Amino acid sequence: MSAMNQHQQNKASLLERLIFNNRPVVIFLCLLVSVFLFYQATQVRPSTSFEKMIPLEHPFIQKMLEHRNDLANLGNTVRISVEAVNGDIFTKEYMETLRQIHDEVFYIPGVDRSGLKSLWSPSVRWTEVTEEGFAGGEVIPQTYDGSPRALEELRNNVLKSGQIGRLVANNFKSSIVDVPLLEMYPNPKNQSELIKLDYRQFSHELEEKIRDKYQLQNPNVKVHIVGFAKKVGDLIDGLVMVVGFFGICLLITLVLLYWFTKCIRSTIAVLITTLVAVLWQLGLLNLVGFGLDPYSMLVPFLIFAIGISHGVQKINGIALQSSGADNALMAARLTFRQLFLPGMIAILADAVGFITLLVIDIGVIRELAIGASIGVAVIVFTNLILLPVAISYIGISKKAVQRSKDDAVREHPFWRLLSNFASPKVAPVSIAIALLMLGGGLWYGKHLKIGDLDQGAPELRPDSRYNLDNDFIIRNYSTSSDVLVVMVKTTPEGCSTHQALAAMDELAWKLENTEGVQSAISMVTVSKQVIKGMNEGNLKWETLSRNQDVLNNSIARADGLYNTDCSLAPLLVFLNDHKAETLDRAVAAVQAFAAENDKDDLQFQLAAGNAGIEAATNEVIKQSELIILVLVYICVAAMCMITFRSFAATLCIVLPLILTSGWSEVA
């Protein structure tokens, strides 16, 4: 070993000597781990659940879970709208197709069969007032035979059923099959064993057994499907497209890396070590018992981007060192010595940023945080250790070394211009401008909306099939797919008292006069209709009676709008959409009413329904946002102080982060 090499060896840290004096062992261990984790990565499966997607500890969700058994049809549901392309629903062919779809859905695993509802359900009935009193029956009677007379009778029954705008479209061109789901259901092969609902499989069954099958069977029928399970299924199906997009990103990165480094060897080395990092992350994800959900499937992209960034820094450093080093090994060691600690601090900062996401009490977000933290930690081994070791063997081309030397001395006009902002004369002006922009960002940030800004599923493209189906239902039905459920809790047998019904009626009126609310339905709606009917259909009697016997009789037909002991009555609020401001207005109206009217024996509790879950999620994000930012700043500042032992240097690093946070809220 030359004198220079001996001197460099003496300056090396224990970690550097341990790694570079045992390079074959390092590569062998990495290869061994890669083979094992590759096998584990092949076992990763798409996985999600309803409860992982919601903030379980939020008061809204706690109340929903507390009354889960009484709200069986108001949680995780799918709505299938069967459209008659030509004509209306009152044809023999359409009704037969609707019956077949109803029966087909009934046998799909995961469906809560007791709550399945369509025009063919015996529980869907009509009622009218006649000279003899009340008359009623099933909307589709047992005598239905598809004849013109039977179809005319069906039309009359639908008009008298109160289902127009709910199960039947306002224009009579489509009707809905309402499908409540079970998160866990008995295994058909072993009834004592419970199976978790597989959203991807369920979505595929809806496509194959319902949409594809019946659209092909009856060209005059078009099927639209919306609901949480369908949305998640579509997101998981997007995984195939994500893999394809990842391949495209790989090719683009290959071209850009080669253009930058001018060395195919180092380009391939960076790509391989970064792909190893992605592979390890997926393998470790399976080892800790996680799968890929619609959110965590984006983590490999993130790990790939971070790995490429650190890899480019390493290659650039080795290229600069190569001009003065004896060989590739020495250049790799000098670069490792120079960049390992800064790289480690940067990776730790990334990991801390992801770990702070654990503050958000949503299962999929926490799994994303853990998965991303694992992936970032893996980069320490693949890009900070394995990459320099690999380059120490294969070296860097002379062309790449020359390019690096030229870049080090070349002054680019743009960067020269930008550097003027840091000159002593201009720096005060730069700081003043930055502070003004921060103030503007904080002021505009007050108007930042937490939640969705558009109709439909923001996770999917506006022209996706799901969002088009959702738009169809919003346009053709009075009851949208966005439902906020207020749970009215009373003492047993207390939900039918005049006090409780009058309070529900007042809340429904307030909500219906709130912007963004389509309608509100509760047992009061049925009670008023029945009381009117018992008084010869006179509209003057469409109100609540103070006679308790009359009230008790009037709610007998309000099936599904109160529980078995009449201690809970859901009030269903149908919204135009689930935009942030729509949810905020509806929730604020309910909370203001509850603050004034809650008593020991009468409470208005939020919230169930998909809109209630969205509102709870928005609140959790809003409450966690500032906490996460503060934690990130504290952790980054602490790491900077430990590393640089300089308060000024720490400020120079942290203050731009704060400025960026303020400005990002403007965007």
Regions inferred by a protein language model and the residue ranges of each:
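Juxtamembrane segments of multi-pass membrane proteins
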Residues: 420-421, 425-545
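Juxtamembrane extramembrane loops of integral membrane proteins
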Residues: 47-116, 496-501
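Helix-loop junctions and hydrophobic alpha-helical segments within the transmembrane domains
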Residues: 321-348
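Extracytoplasmic
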Residues: 96, 144-264, 502, 548-636
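Transmembrane alpha-helices and their membrane-interface boundaries in multi-pass membrane transporters
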Residues: 2, 28, 287, 304-316, ...
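Signature of alpha-helical transmembrane segments and their immediate interfacial
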Residues: 2-48, 389, 403-454, 468-471
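Interfacial segments of transmembrane alpha-helices in multi-pass membrane proteins
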Residues: 236-292, 359-363, 627-667
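Short amphipathic beta-strand/extended segments in non-transmembrane regions
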Residues: 81-84, 98-127, 505-529
